[in-house]
Amino acid sequence: MPTGTISVNDGTVNVSDLEVKYQGTGTTSYNSATAPTNAGTYTVTYKVPDTNTNYTGTFSVAFTIKKAQLDKVTIVKDTFEYTGDEIVPQDSNFDLNKMNFSGDIKATNVGNYSITVSLKDKDNYEWKDSTTTDLVLNWSITQATPDYTVPTGLTSVKGKILADVVLPTGFTWNAPATVLTVGKTKYKATYTPVDTTNYKTITDIDI
């Protein structure tokens, strides 16, 4: 409560003896002798009580309680490579007491994911850019490079085609109809992993 006095005709009245009323203004609804705590616009009125037969008077002051501002939540790293293990992106500025989160807070497989962060109390809190809009944080898991061993020691006969040369499981010739010639020649092949969702297909391998 403010300190001071109201002077009337050279007399004084202690602030502690005054009646105090807080009222909301504009769109703020409030009417109490107790000071408000929520964001809004108010007036506080000090009034000499009717029981005081020596003095009369009132004094009003307008004031505003602004919304507390919070840093927006961000994701420290938003792109991960598939590992086979569960991935949980690390956030920055998240406050469990003041914010809610929902969505894809963890994932294992390759894909695009999103987390939504919202303010629990939008009447009293806002982001530092003065907005209260829910935040959508996007993150992703990308394909990993599969382990594979390039086959060696393959032989065939002149006039045959590449398709006649058998490759290990997962490998295919890029141009299987190619006619073979004499000599040591490298040909392009592709390795396709069993899990094509989480692992890259490797093209243009020299064999």
Protein language model annotation of sequence segments:
Residues M1-I207:
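Solvent-exposed beta-strand/loop surfaces, strongest in extracytoplasmic domains of secreted
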